[in-house]
Curated annotation (Swiss-Prot):
The lineage of its organism: Archaea, Methanobacteriati, Methanobacteriota, Thermococci, Thermococcales. GO terms for molecular function: spermidine synthase activity. Signal peptide: none annotated. It comes from Pyrococcus abyssi (strain GE5 / Orsay). This is Polyamine aminopropyltransferase. It is found in: Cytoplasm.
Length: 279
């Protein structure tokens, strides 16, 4: 048996699976969990791979740590999405963080992640019970939350792809709200889809961000389970250089995939993409 996620133009990513462990429907989406033959458990939302438990760090590390290490003192962090718990887990690796708020619209994704995925080390359960001192969970719409809340050093958007229901998270209006929610200096990051298969969406998001943020960067990273390389977009408020990270803090993290040595390589986009991203 296989699980196949089909991308545009007939491109697919497939996993051999032993069994389907869970299938359900929340108010927002279809949720599935599979046991794969070689990559642990697979979480899919509306047929789209969110993670495989053996390799998920390749996504969560590359989303979180570059921006956290580029900020001189990331004390207050907002995570929008990330119901599987991987992003908030990585945020809390940074001892500078005093408060992290995670806003997830679909509570059932969190419940499934707690029961069947377990990559968060018990963090989600503690957050659901209000027992985590440094992290707070809010069940709600991140688009609405960011309209009424501000004072964040870092904003991380861990959403589904920049097509369909998540499209609002890649709009100029949302970027304006995010910019206002950031302290100065502040830094914003979002995943932006497959470099090769969602190039047009990547360019559109980059252009929208460039109209709002003081500086915008695009980078990519090979992610297990996705149509890699996977793109990420960073928006800067104030005077920060995303290419420069705190090396001492980085060395303390001892991560599996991302480290200071490969930080420079994440900016190496294919030539045609670089040409499309030029001002």
């Amino acid at each position: 048996m296989e699980f196949i996620e089909w991308y545009p133009r007939g491109y697919g990513v497939a996993f051999k699976v032993k069994e389907k462990i869970f299938e359900g429907h929340s108010k927002f989406q279809k949720i599935e969990v599979y046991e794969t033959e070689g990559f642990g458990r697979l979480l899919a939302l509306d047929g789209t791979v969110q993670l495989v438990t053996e390799g998920e760090e390749s996504y969560h590390e590359s989303l979180v740590h570059p921006v956290m290490l580029a900020h001189p003192n990331p004390r207050r962090v907002l995570v929008i999405g990330g119901g599987d718990g991987g992003t908030i887990r990585e945020v809390l690796r940074h001892e500078e963080v005093e408060e992290a708020i995670m806003v997830e619209i679909d509570e059932e994704v969190i419940e499934v992640a707690i029961k069947f995925i377990g990559i968060d080390g018990g963090l989600l359960d503690k957050m659901m019970k209000g027992e985590c001192k440094r992290a707070k969970l809010i069940i709600g719409d991140g688009v609405e939350f960011i309209k009424e809340n501000s004072g964040f050093d870092v904003v991380i958007v861990d959403s589904t792809d920049p097509v369909g229901p998540a499209k609002m998270l890649f709009s100029r209006e949302f970027y304006e709200r995010a910019y206002e929610a950031l302290n100065d200096p502040g830094i914003y990051v979002t995943q932006a889809g497959s470099v090769y298969l969602f190039t047009d969406e990547l360019v559109t998001a980059y252009e929208n961000m460039s109209r709002v943020f003081d500086k915008v960067y695009a980078y990519s990273f090979p992610v297990i389970g996705y149509a890699s390389p996977w793109a990420f977009l960073v928006g800067i408020k104030g005077d920060l250089d995303f290419r420069k990270i705190d090396l001492e803090r980085a060395k303390k993290l001892n991560l599996k995939y991302y480290d200071p040595e490969n930080h420079e390589t994440i900016f190496q986009m294919p030539r045609y993409v670089r040409e499309m991203l030029k001002p």
